[in-house]
């Protein structure tokens, strides 16, 4: 909170701001570098809420994570040329910007993964390391995802596999 206050006062007084807390993500000062590092750090799963992902460098990193076998799920819109699958949020309007990494860390802020919001506008976010908060964010994402077309297909496939296992167990 102290670091956010320093940022506010620097902006209010029209003074330059130099980020001091590694968990604070501030555009345009450090958002591209910190969010890039955050995305690159995903080993198993990357769950993204973002109304409009269009930054080429960030999409390149996301595509690399997909190639590396990371389960990447994006709720929002993704620029089509990248062929990165996404789902519409099942609610009325998606406004949140959040990324949940490997169920252990999360980013929550006002930055979309768009060039304008990473490089030009004053936007602020935070890297969350509190396991309880991250778990709650993960649970909300999973509930939202279950309502999407992909989520419904995944649930149907899992139910079919479960029935098959039950039949095999009953036959033996």
Give the ranges of each region predicted by the language model:
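Acidic, amphipathic alpha-helical patches
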Residues: 35
